[in-house]
Amino acid sequence: LGDVYKRQVVDHHNTAGFGAGAIIAIYTQSSDRQVQSIAYSTDNGRSFIKYENNPVLVSEANDFRDPKVFWYEGTQRWVMLLAVGQEMQIFSSPNLKEWTYESSFGEGYGAHGGVWECPDLFELPVEGTNEKKWVLLCNLNPGGPFGGSATQYFIGSFDGKKFSCDNQPNVTKWMDWGKDHYATVTWSDAPDNRRIAIAWMSNWQYANDVPTSQYRSPNSIPRDLSLFAIDGGIYLQSAPSPELL
């Protein structure tokens, strides 16, 4: 079914039936179309077995990729975000095999200079308050503040099915103002409930022209993310992870 772009989860509750603690890789396979498939590992990631009934999610859309999957306690279901054209689509599943479409986000919000990619969705506390907010990361190419690739973000709420944005539709918030910052991803279950992010340090304006051998540009340093409030708005900030210092 073509090239593979993937993320993984640990199935602590054996919802997929591959065994408690199995590592499940959820990945986009790309050939004449893009579909979502899964593979599982029961030996701590040393080897993976493809699920026999792949793909688990298909679409007629040309761009249908980059799954972000996490467990949502409120509904006791898995949630998957997918980049579909210039929007993010949200699906849910009890077992990582059978997926239900829940909602879409993106039309009329933020920057739309090019295709949306590499979604992420997570909850963070707002510094100095008792409030928590959900952050939706959206990588955009082209259409960044200096052209080419960039990561924008949205602040809002999430109920397990739908993301509701607090921003006005015409407000665009950029995670980083450098040109070499794209395909941002974050890790769940980091120590002390931290949210750690890393990005690809390149830009599709010139990524294919950068001298390379076995890789295509470096990754950024890991950064801890947090939210702060100022002048009636809530914003995302980052700082180098303390392990680097």
Identify what each model region corresponds to.
Residues K6-G19, R65-G74, P119-T129, V185-P191:
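Structural signature of eukaryotic scaffold interfaces centered on beta-propeller domains
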Residues A16-A25, T75-V79, N130-L136, N193-A197:
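Entry beta-strands of beta-propeller and related beta-repeat scaffolds
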Residues S30-R33, Q86, N141-G144, W204-Q205:
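Short glycine/acidic-enriched loop and turn motifs that connect beta-strands
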Residues R33-A39, E87-I90, P145-I155, I221:
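Structural motif
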